[in-house]
């Protein structure tokens, strides 16, 4: 396969992105050349998402887009991997003859072997779809070709999910929760830091469930203490926590370790107790409120992000107004809202009192409008404050020529910090002390007060 060129498109969440990075590195080790555009590629590889309807639609659209390159260019084969074939492999094969090979989630470590067989013409129609039980769990021995900027990387600490939310298909796609041993995670983290990574972003389906399946039941708090000992690492950020997992031990570790950002992503989905029960979420509204209040009390200057679902079956106007009142009261720093997507095979799909798509979208928009006001007000309170900013690169603004993120901002999902002053340009990955001089709904504007570290 030497000099075979491969173009990889990765859709969905950061956890899926890591799978794509592993496949890219394995293909490169096998002699392939990873290229940035489909027009350069012999092989097109699409790693898909199938979590909700919009994700499936995006995946199908991308298959058709890449298939056009296959028809028109030098591309020889189109491979589709990930959650979509894991869920619909046989159906996809019947409907999409343009695709040469469909691979499920457990085939990530075998990608080079599959490509070799495909290029040798040994793949038959019978094994055009290869989907097995989702048992793959990456370890530090799996290489990664980072697709994120070199100063920031995601670190997958577990795979799968043992929560049984009534609306969610993830346990069927990814299997039960499987945690990586602390020693293995530390090996990968050390390698990433040696490669220049300054920000590690911990991800899993539920990061606070980390270790429950391992002997000795190590906790996320213990893992964080170990990671915080990596000397040249600047920031550790935690995504995908669960309200019931915000233990005092975890909150105190975040509060007392300088390298851990005062930032928590806590998807709560709803606040109405009837809706939470129908969702089969662990914990009620009292637990959610208590968890968030404790987090803010323990961690100074905590930035809170959450995700919500609108239009879940049974969400009456009164229940929705309870949700919007909670958002107004709690004042999250960052918020994502998703209209409920009925997923085939989930208990929620069969619930009575389904809500119209139009109502779901309207309620989502109302929440986001309210959040824009809240975010603007919170950002205004930051004007005059000192913030450490991780420089990402040049911006398009002549007034603020550099762009970055402060500890309150996760990549891709939160706002940005625009930077002026100092001896610019700064190298991407530099940490700069800044004073916030202005703010809008989602972004901050800062002036450098000290040189990069």
Swiss-Prot record:
It comes from the Bacteria. Residues 380-450 form the TRAM domain. Catalyzes the methylthiolation of an aspartic acid residue of ribosomal protein uS12. [4Fe-4S] cluster 1 binds at residues 13, 49, 83. Its cofactor is [4Fe-4S] cluster. The keyword Iron applies. [4Fe-4S] cluster 2 binds at residues 161, 165, 168. The keyword Acetylation does not apply. Keywords: 4Fe-4S, Cytoplasm, Iron, Iron-sulfur, Metal-binding, S-adenosyl-L-methionine, Transferase. The gene is rimO. This is Ribosomal protein uS12 methylthiotransferase RimO. GO terms for molecular function: 4 iron, 4 sulfur cluster binding; aspartic acid methylthiotransferase activity; metal ion binding; protein methylthiotransferase activity. Binds 2 [4Fe-4S] clusters. One cluster is coordinated with 3 cysteines and an exchangeable S-adenosyl-L-methionine. It catalyses: L-aspartate(89)-[ribosomal protein uS12]-hydrogen + (sulfur carrier)-SH + AH2 + 2 S-adenosyl-L-methionine = 3-methylsulfanyl-L-aspartate(89)-[ribosomal protein uS12]-hydrogen + (sulfur carrier)-H + 5'-deoxyadenosine + L-methionine + A + S-adenosyl-L-homocysteine + 2 H(+). Residues 147-377 form the Radical SAM core domain.
């Amino acid at each position: 396969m030497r000099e075979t060129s491969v173009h990889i498109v990765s859709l969905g969440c950061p956890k899926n992105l890591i799978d794509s990075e592993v496949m890219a590195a394995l293909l490169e080790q096998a002699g392939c050349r990873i290229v940035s555009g489909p027009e350069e590629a012999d092989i097109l590889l699409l790693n898909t998402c199938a979590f909700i309807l919009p994700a499936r639609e995006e995946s199908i659209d991308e298959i058709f887009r890449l298939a056009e390159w296959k028809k028109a260019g030098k591309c020889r084969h189109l491979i589709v991997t990930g959650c979509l074939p894991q869920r619909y492999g046989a159906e996809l094969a019947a409907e999409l003859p343009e695709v040469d090979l469909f691979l499920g989630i457990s085939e990530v470590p075998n990608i080079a072997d599959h490509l070799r067989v495909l290029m040798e013409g040994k793949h038959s129609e019978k094994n055009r779809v290869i989907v097995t039980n989702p048992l793959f769990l990456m370890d530090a021995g799996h290489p990664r070709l980072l697709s994120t900027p070199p100063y920031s990387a995601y670190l997958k600490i577990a795979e799968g999910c043992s929560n049984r939310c009534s609306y969610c298909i993830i346990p069927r796609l990814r299997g039960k929760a499987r945690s990586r041993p602390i020693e293995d995670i530390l090996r990968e983290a050390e390698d990433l830091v040696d490669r220049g990574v300054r920000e590690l972003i911990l991800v899993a389906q539920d990061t606070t469930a980390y270790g429950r399946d391992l002997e000795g039941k190590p906790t996320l708090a213990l893992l964080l203490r170990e990671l915080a000992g990596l000397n040249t690492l600047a920031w550790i950020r935690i995504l995908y926590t669960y309200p019931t997992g915000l233990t005092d031990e975890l909150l105190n570790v975040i509060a007392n370790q300088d390298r851990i950002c005062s930032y928590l992503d806590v998807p709560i989905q709803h606040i109405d107790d009837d809706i939470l029960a129908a969702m089969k979420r662990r914990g009620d509204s009292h637990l959610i409120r208590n968890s968030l209040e404790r987090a803010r009390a323990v961690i100074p200057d905590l930035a809170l992000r959450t995700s919500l679902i609108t239009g879940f079956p049974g969400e009456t106007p009164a229940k929705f107004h309870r949700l919007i009142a909670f958002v107004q009261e709690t004042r999250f720093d960052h918020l994502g809202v998703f209209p409920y997507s009925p997923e085939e095979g989930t208990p929620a799909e069969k619930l009575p009192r389904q809500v119209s798509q139009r109502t779901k979208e309207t309620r989502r928009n109302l929440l986001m409008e309210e959040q824009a006001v809240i975010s603007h007000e919170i950002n205004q309170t930051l004007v005059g404050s000192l913030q450490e900013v991780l420089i990402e690169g040049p911006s398009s603004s002549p007034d603020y020529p550099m762009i970055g993120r402060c500890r309150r901002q996760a990549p891709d999902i939160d706002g940005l910090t625009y930077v002026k002053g100092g001896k610019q340009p700064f190298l991407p990955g530099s940490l700069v002390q800044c004073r916030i001089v202005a703010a809008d709904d989602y972004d901050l504007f800062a002036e450098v007060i000290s040189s990069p570290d």
